[in-house]
Amino acid sequence: MREIVFVTPTDERNIFRESVGPLLLATILQSKGIKSHILSFASFGSPADFAEFMETGVRRICEKEPKIVSFYTRSDCYHIMLKMAQLVKARLGCPIIFAGPQADIIARETLEEIPFVDFVCCGEGENTVYPFFSSLLRGEPDLSVDGLVYRKDGDIVMNPRPKLIEDLDTIPFVDYRICPEDEPANAQIGFPIDVGRGCPFGCTYCSTKTFWGRKYRLKSPARIVEEMQRNYDLYGARHFTFQHDMFTMNKALVKETCRLIKELPFKATWNCSARLDCIDEELIDVMADAGLYHIYLGIETGSPRMQKLINKNLKLEGVRERIAYLLSKNLQVTTSFIFGFPEETEEEVSQTFSLVTDLLRLGGVRVQMHRCAFLPGTAMYEEYKDRLEPAVGFSDMTGGVGVAECGDLFRDHPKLFTYFNEYTTELRTKLLHFPIFLNSLLSMRAVYLYLAEKYPRDRLIQMYFDFVEKNRGVLEQAELSRDEMVALIRENDLFVKSFTGDPCEPMIADAYRLRRARTAVSRGEMPTATEITCVSPLELDRGIPVNRCKAGWYMVTYYLDDKGAVKVQVRHT
């Protein structure tokens, strides 16, 4: 029997992919003699079979016979956590606690509308988890604990948030032994290290400042490197993910961390997140020399006006050059963009799309684009919340997982799922299919970038409008899921096929056919190219093109090895 079970939304069967927050809290309880256990979504099977997934999850939780069940919540899985908590409460009757970012922000609304959730714990829990959980186990819950939200005489009581932990070095090391014994333990991935917390910036679409109060904190360089050494000694970890929204804010501490990393007795690699205006060539050199291999950068918009409106305030001059410099150091770069801001114009979407195409042409840049969502705890949500309307369907936050099965929750409790709420503008309506267009762009990158050159840069959005018009027959089939639309268009992209008579039509046709068929030989379709030609970035278009050259038929296979390096294999057939 376990006294506490923490349920997490981790969807990969690897204990080193587990959320650090619940692991830390479980570690603290375990060190105090309270048996704790982690159960992740990954251990419940595939959510594609939602009924089986839910039944397995509830069964595994109940098998532990816990006295308390705590659910770690994010916006992408709140509906699933609520549905599972309802079933667990019905079977066990034990106290149900919600925590994590989503529950934290809508704690009052959750307790007002969801009777089977007993408590919500807000803020940093390292100093409050033991006092509250131990009192609850004794049957005498301490309702004075900071960060606790609970019901009393029909009212919702919200205690003051816990004070932020000033010295993050005092937080204990995670004990991964609390994870299930049957969970795989692959340390050869980005082993997570909580290096710090908080972002001092105030972007209107982001809720990070709500959690941490815009207070930037970083563990000491010595502690960060000690965690790397410890996890190498215990688990053989060599590749690390530095978990922090803005790791590079304090350049002096970052440089000292890099100096100590280089003194480790093993070759360590790591990745982090940053702002472009918080890195320069000197810092890039230092980080790359110390093992940095991947960096995540939120750019969000290519419009100077929108940069100001969303309070991101990035200077866009030099963005391409800075990212080109990162690539010159053999670093992997992921950039994030948002489209569909309430005040955004078609010209500003074109500016963003133009910047995206420029970055893609650099090669080696991964691009993410997200539809603007109105999340509680953000300034944008506060400004527009009275003008939002429920629009349950596909969301960038959830995809389609559990949406149909949790329809009653969405219908009855719209305040809990604001990412399904829509602020309607003419442009946001026009951009409904933009994610499908972007999927086609990224999967046929070379072809789409070539076609983009046929449009004026300041009206690049017209390329999207033409894509929608040519593929309208698929996009207007309401019964199709987004994934089904993507698959059909990938099989028969009428936008690409509309460029008949283009000088590069033969190459476009070959590239399209190879991407569609993946293995040209299996379809009996031979490309018309007469030389071995790379027609698109290898990391995205990896099929098996067969090319006719003077020496005969050759099979050329492009693939990525386990370190992310491009490999080319040529075999005579």
Show the residue positions of the predicted features.
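Structural recognition of alpha->loop->beta junctions
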Residues: T110-N127, D289-H294, S354-M369
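A short, glycine/small-residue-rich beta-strand->loop->alpha-helix junction that serves as a flexible
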Residues: D11-V20, T73-Y78
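Residue-level recognition of beta-strand->loop/alpha-helix junctions
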Residues: T8, I38-G45, Y72, T210, ...
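Structural motif
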Residues: E3, K67-I68, F119, H239-T241
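C-terminal accessory regions of radical SAM enzymes
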Residues: I4-N14, V149-K152, E347-V496
